[in-house]
Amino acid sequence: MLSLFDTFNARRQENITKSAGGAIIPGQKNTVSIFALGPTITDDNEKMTLALLFLSHSLDNEKQHAQRAGFLVSLLSMAYANPELYLTTNGSNADVKYVIYMIEKDLKRQKYGGFVVKTREMIYEKTTEWIFGSDLDYDQETMLQNGRNNSTIEDLVHTFGYPSCLGALIIQIWIVLVKAITSISGLRKGFFTRLEAFRQDGTVQAGLVLSGDTVDQIGSIMRSQQSLVTLMVETLITMNTSRNDLTTIEKNIQIVGNYIRDAGLASFFNTIRYGIETRMAALTLSTLRPDINRLKALMELYLSKGPRAPFICILRDPIHGEFAPGNYPAIWSYAMGVAVVQNRAMQQYVTGRSYLDIDMFQLGQAVARDAEAQMSSTLEDELGVTHEAKESLKRHIRNINSSETSFHKPTGGSAIEMAIDEEPEQFEHRADQEQDGEPQSSIIQYAWAEGNRSDDRTEQATESDNIKTEQQNIRDRLNKRLNDKKKQGSQPSTNPTNRTNQDEIDDLFNAFGSN
């Protein structure tokens, strides 16, 4: 029988890893032009002007996405003293072939400020005109926030220096990557949220903040050009973080890289954190056993990917779909139940998925609130916890959890409607059990965390009483004012202002009825 189980496990492993084989046939590649600055360009203002020009070309809708991505690569490579070496190290890709052109400054030429595109000694006039003579939709005024009110490039470079200004542009492109692939709808919001930290520490100057439309355009390029994303991921992988001479730009790239790592795998790692690593007794349930075995196989697959494992979703690795929580719904539902109890921030996590197992979700919450389940016997022995301290800790946990005897609802998605539709039946079922004297389920005895209905009725009654009291106060004030008017004289006043006040009093008095 045990050998049969081993066979099943081997079949599951093969189904996940999908053993490779067959011949390697090269595919078609796009030829993409990359532009690097030559040694004749030494002025910092000119370098920054070219950086903004590359960004403008990347936003030009008249160009193909592959070439627009090439201009972004040109901008990213400006962070390095040797762009050719950077592209040789990180630019190997199955989709594109990079061709590097140099931009030089020829003092004998007056057109386009003396800039010229060349390779070795060959000058490309048409390419020069294509880059420097094009009418672009985006310029400094449109691709940067409040461009017309920003300082000039010369002012920014003079104040902050060229490396700092260039780094401000490059780091924003990296921030776009955080959400560009895994969360399209939250791209703009996520970008400005993460950008705020870099604005506060002075990394990104206010005059160089990208506009929201620019962020969306760059995100669109990243989604359509996997070669650009691959280059950026390879940059993170090959960057030697143990070096002592990392530039400021490289350090900031590493900071953003922490957000990019494991992007799209939050459900997988939250399941392991709250479902497996908590090591509660519920893991012994046979219902969870298949999903636990699948998690084990997935973790082995993840580790087999080596340094590229944290980026399987960003790189759109064919196996990244195996890590979706729909492939292990029972243990995921249980883990989310534990999570919403142990970590309040997880109560905002979208758990209302179509594959959510409500029973497992409730079980996770019930187990997480249980004082005995929260204590590890292994750690008790290791730490030398006395019996009295253990009982005291249990008592404290019970006191804390005594006010939380209701289940948290799943948030977002179709499971909310499903839970609400089932709720009246659950209440009715509990009422029948109480009448028949039958024992209640340890799971169903919890209500959804929305407050008792009696509390709602009490709030409504209190609100109604407050309204009646306020109405009575208004009546009393109106009566008092009316009596004062009568005492002043029995004849009605001919003053228009007094007449208006009297009409207003009469209308208000009639609106609330007679006393």
From Swiss-Prot:
Chain intervals for the UniProt region annotation (Ncore): 1-403
Residues annotated for RNA binding in this entry: 179, 189, 194, 259, 349, 353
Compartment(s) of residence: Virion; Host cytoplasm
Protein name: Nucleoprotein
UniProt-annotated stretches for the region Ntail: 404-515
Variant or mutagenesis effect after changing residue 457 to Q: In strain: JS
Disulfide bonds listed in the record: none
Outcome of swapping residue 129 to D: In strain: JS
Keyword RNA-binding assigned: yes
Cellular component, GO annotation: helical viral capsid; host cell cytoplasm; ribonucleoprotein complex; viral nucleocapsid
Entry function: Forms the helical nucleocapsid (NC) in a ratio of 1 N per 6 ribonucleotides, protecting the genome from nucleases. The encapsidated genomic RNA serves as template for transcription and replication; encapsidation by N is coupled to RNA synthesis. Forms the encapsidation complex with the phosphoprotein protein P. Before encapsidation, the newly synthesized free N protein, so-called N0, is chaperoned by P. Together with P, inhibits the integrated stress response (ISR) in the infected cell via the formation of inclusion bodies (IBs) shielding its own newly synthesized viral RNAs.
Record's compositionally biased regions (Basic and acidic residues): 452-487
GO molecular function: RNA binding; structural molecule activity
Source domain of life: Viruses
Region described as Disordered: 450-515
Native source organism of the sequence: Human parainfluenza 3 virus (strain Wash/47885/57)
Family in the record: Belongs to the paramyxoviruses nucleocapsid family.
UniProt biased composition (Polar residues): 489-500
Alphabetized UniProt keyword annotations: Capsid protein, Helical capsid protein, Host cytoplasm, Ribonucleoprotein, RNA-binding, Viral nucleoprotein, Virion
Domain notes: Ncore is globular and carries the regions required for self-assembly and RNA-binding. Ntail is an intrinsically disordered monomeric domain in the C-terminus.
Mutation effect (residue 436 to N): In strain: JS
Annotated stretches, region: Interaction with the phosphoprotein: 457-466
Subunit structure: Homomultimer; forms the nucleocapsid. Binds to the viral genomic RNA. N0 interacts with the phosphoprotein (via N-terminus); this interaction allows P to chaperon N0 to avoid N polymerization before encapsidation. Interacts as N-RNA template with the phosphoprotein (via C-terminus); this interaction positions the polymerase on the template.
Pfam family, one: Paramyxo_ncap
Principal location class: virion
